[in-house]
């Protein structure tokens, strides 16, 4: 059993991290865990100051300094490295086309991280051909999700603006990643809250076996039922060996966007959860089943400390609703 690694206390993996390690080994390579994005603005940047702000953001964020290790028995552990000065890359795309720049960054996103005792994020300062400048960020889903990614990039922006412009306040401290996962482990160690949740979800699971829902309707499930000669089969294969990333941009008109945002504000629902409910409704209409199950690594954070502690979270979603009511 490992207790320390490189002088740092080690901790078990969280539920979300265990989930990622459940499916990732069955994929062609570990790049399936990569999250790549870019953030740019149409203004000239002080690259030296931006580099300082990036390193300062790393120093303020325990979750972005997480490393992983395995013991002799094959058990995974995580630990947090001390802050260190990182060499931040700079790439000038100004002599390229936008398409060439995007293609190059998509290539970066296909390169898997080393999983042991190594950084699991990468930042590149980028100068784009259209006059926009900023950063490309690549993170491993074992330590990053949408919420922690946004929070980290926001911190870089606020640190940079504080250093460059008068009257811009210094950002508030980030929350401790270690303290947050310790609270999670306390919950998982037989707490009353966990026991209540287990009882609830056990009842939900025992109601009926989840059924496969497909983007394109029931054809896949029907073919599985015929293959296995089981008309009551509720599961189906849905696998691919393609882990390539791609970029799709969808433009939503102003009026429906405003209605969505107003709904979220009025009922205190996150946009991610609203989109999840929309997916559930779509699957139900396409397949005709009352029961829809989704597993999604969304920003499951209820408190400010959870939102600012970084890391990756996961929430299962199962919805059963009469079809004729939709």
For the regions a language model picked out, list residue spans one by one.
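Short amphipathic alpha-helices and their capping loops
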Residues: 1-28, 51-96, 119, 154, ...
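Active-site-proximal acidic secondary-structure segment that organizes catalysis
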Residues: 3-5, 10-12, 16, 91, ...
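A generic structural motif
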Residues: 41-45, 139-144, 323-326
């Amino acid at each position: 059993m490992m207790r320390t690694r490189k002088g740092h206390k080690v901790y078990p993996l969280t539920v979300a991290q265990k989930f990622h390690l459940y499916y990732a080994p069955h994929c062609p390579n570990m790049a399936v865990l990569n999250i790549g994005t870019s953030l740019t603005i149409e203004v000239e940047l002080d690259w030296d100051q931006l580099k300082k702000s990036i390193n300062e953001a790393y120093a303020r964020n325990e979750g972005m300094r997480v490393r992983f290790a395995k013991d002799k028995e094959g058990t995974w552990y995580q630990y947090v490295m001390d802050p260190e000065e990182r060499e931040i890359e700079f790439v000038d795309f100004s002599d390229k086309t936008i398409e060439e720049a995007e293609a190059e960054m998509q290539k970066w996103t296909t390169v898997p991280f080393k999983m042991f005792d190594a950084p699991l994020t990468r930042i590149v300062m980028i100068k784009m051909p259209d006059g926009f400048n900023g950063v490309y960020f690549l993170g491993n889903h074992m330590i990053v999700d949408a919420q922690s990614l946004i929070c980290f990039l926001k911190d870089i922006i606020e640190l940079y603006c504080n250093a460059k412009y008068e009257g811009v306040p210094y950002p508030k401290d980030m929350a401790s990643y270690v303290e947050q996962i310790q609270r999670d482990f306390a919950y998982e160690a037989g707490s009353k809250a966990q026991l209540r949740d287990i009882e609830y979800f056990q009842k939900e699971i025992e109601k009926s076996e989840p059924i496969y829902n497909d983007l394109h309707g029931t054809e896949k499930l029907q073919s599985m039922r015929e293959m296995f000669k089981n008309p009551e089969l509720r599961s189906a294969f849905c696998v691919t060996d393609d882990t390539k990333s791609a970029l799709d941009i969808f433009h939503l008109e102003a009026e429906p966007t405003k209605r969505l945002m107003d709904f979220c504000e009025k009922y205190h629902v996150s946009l991610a959860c609203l989109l999840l409910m929309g997916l559930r409704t779509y699957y139900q209409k396409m397949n005709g089943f009352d029961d829809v199950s989704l597993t999604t690594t969304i920003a499951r954070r209820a408190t400010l400390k959870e939102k600012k502690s970084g890391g990756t979270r996961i929430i299962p979603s199962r919805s059963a609703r009469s079809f004729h009511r939709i």
